[in-house]
Amino acid sequence: VRRFEHLTVVTNSIQNALVLSERPEFTVILIGGILDKKELSLGNDFSQMLESLHLDILFMSVSGVHPSVGLTDQGPSEARVQKQMCQIADRTVVLADSSKFGRASLVKLCALCDVDQIITDGGLDTDMEQKIKDTGVTLDVVRNGER
């Protein structure tokens, strides 16, 4: 995020909005809805607002990354937002630490081949890494000390 001089960010995460609001050159669009106190995010039916937007790149996190099930998340409300944002984005990048791999949560978001890139840490075993790559998605593993 530091390399961008001007950036418009669309989020339903209050925490992300607060962090990004510290950058005066960024525009933050916080999508409204019902507050999920546990996740500190807003969820509800705000699909009309999302339908009017275009996203160049969507960065999203998930609860599970499974080679055959795909990308999953715990909350139906959050999953609905993620699915719609994937549809309006030119490019989707998933950020998931290695503990999320091989897991499938409650709500299926999409197949792995439906996203452009997955970025994870160096804790992924080589067998799982190969299974993910076999789905056709670009997998980038960031090892300790790499940027």
Task: Give residue ranges: language-model regions.
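Glycine-rich beta-alpha loop segments
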Residues: V1-E5, V10
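Conserved phosphate- and dinucleotide-binding cores of soluble alpha/beta proteins
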Residues: T8, Q15-R147
